[in-house]
C-alpha cells in the first residue's frame, strides 16, 4: 500500500513539474507567438479595440478610427475607400489586415518600440492611448487621375518619384470598399468577403503588387 502511495505521489510530482515547466516556457519564451496568435481573444479585443492612428494623404485622413458602442470601442472607417483601397488595404477582426494597415500595424496600433516613451507618457498623464498617424507620400491628385484612367478596366498604375523612390500614386482596378470588411459584425464581414472573393473580376487582388501580372508601360 505504501509503495502504491509513493508511486502515486511520484507521478503527481512529475505531472506538477511538467506543468510548471510548460507554464514557465510559455510565460518567458512563447509570449510573442501567443500575443500574435489571431485566435487569442484578448489580443483580438486589445488590437481591434484600440484607438488606431490615421492614415493620411495630403493632410486628409483616408483611414481613421471613430468611437463605437460595442465591445471593440473603436470602428475603423475609410473615406474615399475605393480610391485608396490598393494603398490602405483593410483592417478586419475576421480576416486580419492588408496594405498599409498591415505593413505599418505596429505604428498605427501604438505598439512599436519607437513609441515606448509615448505609451509611458500616456500612462502617467492619464490620457487615452492612441496609435501614431502614418502620412503617405501619395499625391491625391495623381491618385485620382490613376483611378480615372483605370475606370472600367482591369489593371494597375503605380507612379514613383525616380529620385527618392516615393510612391506618388498606386491604384488597382477593379477596386472595392474596405469598409465592408471593417464591420464589427462577423457574419456581415464573412458574407461581404465571400461576395468579393467570388467576384470573377477579383477586386481583392491588388494588381499593383501582385507580381508580374502586367508589363510596365
Indicate residue ranges for each PLM-predicted region:
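Extracytoplasmic/periplasmic proteins that interact with beta-lactams or build/remodel peptidoglycan
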Residues: 1-156, 171-209
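Active-site-proximal helix/loop microenvironment
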Residues: 209-217
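Surface-exposed patches in mature extracellular/periplasmic domains of secreted proteins
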Residues: 156-162
